[in-house]
């Protein structure tokens, strides 16, 4: 029997076997939590223990937990805590800190160096972690995808997708892609500058999430880590008390 990790997001659902203190080979369903309903039950693994992180709607989380409880002897759901695996969360009320951000920090802390952790999903999240595991807070904004969707919802003539990044675009689709991607990059760059001032050293930049690949060409020196949340979930799992 085996232990598995499950990350239930707004736009993607990912799972992987637990291998030591990291995630093994990751499988993903592109349509996230809602797409889960169309999957046959046998497409999910079974085993001894399921470790689950979810930022999806409560009804979808409940549906997934119901399936997992039929396939695993034990099911553990992550909750953000003030401290775990050497990471100390800056929020006065840690339960208000998103579990995906929490797990990303647990994974990033393993390197024991200052790091700016950037998540690009429905939201753009930016969190600063120092080499000692102290979280210094962060920012939340709309991701480029969400910016595009919001503009399209208010002005249907503005396409929600398409276009290529250009510093000075000469058509609408490119201008939208450039503006929304550029806004995200500017916030990341501003955060990196302020982090350098605060810590006295430039942090490394660690980027994850479904929207990350589009930004990577604009972030020289950044590292892309697509399984960061699952790796953080693995660290959370191995740092839980026995039993």
Swiss-Prot record:
Active site: 100
Pathway recorded for this protein: Cofactor biosynthesis; coenzyme A biosynthesis; CoA from (R)-pantothenate: step 1/5
Disulfide bonds: none
GO CC terms in record: cytoplasm
Known catalytic reactions: (R)-pantothenate + ATP = (R)-4'-phosphopantothenate + ADP + H(+)
Keywords: ATP-binding, Coenzyme A biosynthesis, Cytoplasm, Kinase, Nucleotide-binding, Potassium, Transferase
Subcellular location: Cytoplasm
Single Gene Ontology BP annotation: coenzyme A biosynthetic process
Binding positions (ATP): 7-14, 122
Cofactor info, note text: A monovalent cation. Ammonium or potassium.
Keyword Transmembrane helix recorded: no
An annotated Gene Ontology molecular function: pantothenate kinase activity
Cofactor(s) needed: NH4(+); K(+)
Binding site for substrate: 91, 98-101, 172
Subunit structure, as described in the record: Homodimer.
UniProt-listed NCBIfam families: baf, PRK13327.1
Entry protein name: Type III pantothenate kinase
Organism: Stenotrophomonas maltophilia (strain K279a)
